[in-house]
Structures are given as C-alpha cells and as structure tokens.
Amino acid sequence: ESLWALDSTNGFGGNEVKQYEKTVVQHYRALWKHNADLAVINSDCDFGKYKLIVAPMLFLLKNGVSERLKEFVRNGGTLAMTYLSAYVDEHNACFFGGNPGGPDLRELFGIWSEDIDGLEPQVRQTFDFNGKRYDAVDYAEFLHAEGAEVLAAYNSEFYAGSPAITSKCYGKGKAVYIGVRTELDFLTEFYGTLLNECGISPVLANVPESLSVSRRIGTDGSEYYFILNLTPGKQIFRLPFPLEDIWNKTGEITKLTLPPSGSTVLKRKQ
C-alpha cells in the first residue's frame, strides 16, 4: 500500500527518485549483512514476537497501526522508522497534527518533521555517526526534537545542526527515527549498533558474508538452518556448534563445505 500511495503522490522528486522497493531491499541487506534472523511482515501482523521492527518509508499508515506500534515499543520492542513514513492514512489523506503520523507517532518518536529537502545530485549533505561522516542521498527531513535524543545532526544547508537521526525511550522500549536517506555503508554500521542494543545475536556466528543463512523453528522445537552459497567458489567454515546435515544426510558435522552456488539444511535438536 505504501508503494501505491507513494507512486500516486505528486512531488518528492518523482517515482524515479522515491525508489520504495530499492530502499526496502537496502535496509534488508544491511540487516542481512549482520546475519540477523529476518522476516518480512506487513502492518497487520502480530508485532509482539519481535524484538526489532524496521519500517522504511512506511508512507501509508493503516487505521490502528500507530496504536499497535506504540504498544509494541511500550512493551519493550525497538522500532526504527525512516523519512517519508506515516504521511497518509489508508484513504491517502494526510494526517492532521504534523508528521510523522500525527500526534500519536510524534509522541512516540519525540520529533516533528517540519519539511523534507529533496537533494539534487550536485548538493552534498552530510552527517556524523559513531565518529564517521556519511552522505545523505535524495532526501533529508528537517526534524525538530520534542523529547528525543539526537544521534546525528546535519552538517550543512539552512537546517545545519538539526537532527538527522533520533532515538526516544518509550515505556520499556525505544523508537528510532532515520530522517535521511543514506548509502548502504551507514545502514550497515547503524543496524549493527541497533542489533547489539536489542540483544539480537547472529543466526550463526562467524558465517562468511557470502553465505545466506536463515533459521526456522520446527514444531518440536528443533532449529533448522537453511544455508546458501551465493558465490561461484567453494566455501568452508567451522560451525559454532555441532549440527546435523539433513540435506546431504552426512550426520552431525562441525565444519561445513559448500560447493559453488551450493545449499544445505542443518538441524539442531532441542
């Protein structure tokens, strides 16, 4: 719905700049690079079983979702939302009370988004995070902190010094707002920090970045690891604990060898 609403909305530089799908994939890739256990969900799902929810460019906010997001954070979850989020409701009508999402989400995130700057390619906007300088790309929201902690601020233009990224404790959890579009390098750094703060460990430790790993839990509580080699070369790595190779039926192993573009399924009994 957010994609359709964005595409039907004039402004924001046109659909060639909005790039909703590319943005979602980029955030997913940044989390995937940390070998996190990921799931793609919609806003109607049960949020309670997750520690961290990332909502990039959630432009359209259905009725009742803001209350459920507040409940999720209040109960200990961490929510990360980005620029161009919660601008319209399910009827494509703007929210009263300011962005993001009117009074409810303004309270949750502790910010007010006054405006959004569409960055021309020749304009360089930057911000600093964890001692490193990063480039803003395409979009930079002009934010005001209303109780939120400023994690990063802009370095230039008329809104220099205003927040680019914020965080606010709410109940037992935390709401983080990324008001700027960035390259993958920042997202990888940022989500690495956020995953650690949330206590989310990698699915498997020390897995090469060239491998894709996902985990699912069986009805008996056993853990199943689906591992794909995404390279044209052989990959070898040592497992952090013994696992049964049920795909190749080679029994319990402690070291995995995958051929080029190979795959396997490993099982850990409970």
Write out the residue ranges for each language-model feature.
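Carbohydrate-binding surfaces of carbohydrate-active enzymes
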Residues: 1-270
